[in-house]
């Protein structure tokens, strides 16, 4: 569970960067998405989900909300793509659509 808490903290840091209008390193972001996807994938078919995973998904939601609020920025197109990756992670977790099982096509759009 320590890995999940670490990922949650990293997403909090990403959110703080957004709030400060700092640039986001795409390679760092893609790596974080891949690591998150691997963790989420391990729990997507489970009947019970650890609280830490719920907190991680909640942090992803906060990040995506701040991206949505960033529409006025010159990087809006990028933020929209970042939001699509977050949506893919969340949909995969909740098993809403099999097309979200592979996150790479979404990362390739960045």
Task: Give each language-model segment a name.
Residues 23-25, 45-48, 72-76:
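Charged, low-complexity interaction regions
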Residues 14-22, 43, 67-71:
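Secondary-structure edge/capping motif, primarily at the C-terminal ends of alpha-helices
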Residues 30, 50-56, 80:
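Short, charged, amphipathic alpha-helical segments
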Residues 39-52:
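Short, solvent-exposed, charged loop/turn and helix-capping segments
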Residues 6, 31, 35-38, 59, ...:
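Charged, amphipathic alpha-helical oligomerization/scaffolding segments
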Residues 37, 41, 62-65:
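Amphipathic alpha-helical core segments of compact helical bundles
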Residues 60-110:
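Amphipathic alpha-helical binding modules
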Residues 1-33:
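Short terminal alpha-helical segments
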